[in-house]
Design a protein with these regions (language model features):
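Histidine/acidic residue-rich metal-binding segments in metalloenzymes
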Residues: 1-98
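Active-site anion/phosphate-binding pocket segments in diverse small-molecule metabolic enzymes
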Residues: 100-106
């Protein structure tokens, strides 16, 4: 199932809203969209987030042309505009971590 940009940002907004409502910390995983980067950069403090290496390494549609189904993952690899914004976040210390996304499946 493809997770759209709208799904990603609406879920991220919901997490932040719940954390603020209950005055709790939250760490948001697998950020992949420029909308999430922009939103989360305005909600630092109790909210931290990660970007995964694969989303900093390849971008769509090139990755699907070159790698086929090996590039399929969830959340999906997005286009270069999202890739560029993720790198902007890394270069400007906006994100808090780069997560391994380590999930071995047999």
């Amino acid at each position: 199932m493809w997770r759209s940009e709208e799904c990603a940002i609406s879920s991220t907004r919901r997490i932040v809203r719940i954390a603020k409502k209950y005055n709790k910390k939250a760490h948001v995983l697998h950020i992949t969209t420029k909308q999430e980067i922009d939103f989360l950069s305005q909600h630092k403090g109790n909210i931290t987030f990660e970007i995964t290496p694969q989303h900093l390494t390849i971008y769509a549609p090139d990755c699907y042309d070159k790698l086929g189904t090996y590039a399929q993952m969830n959340p999906p690899i997005r286009d270069k505009s999202h890739y560029d914004r993720l790198w902007y976040a890394v270069k400007n210390n906006i994100n808090d971590t780069i997560g391994s996304d380590h999930a071995p499946h047999l």
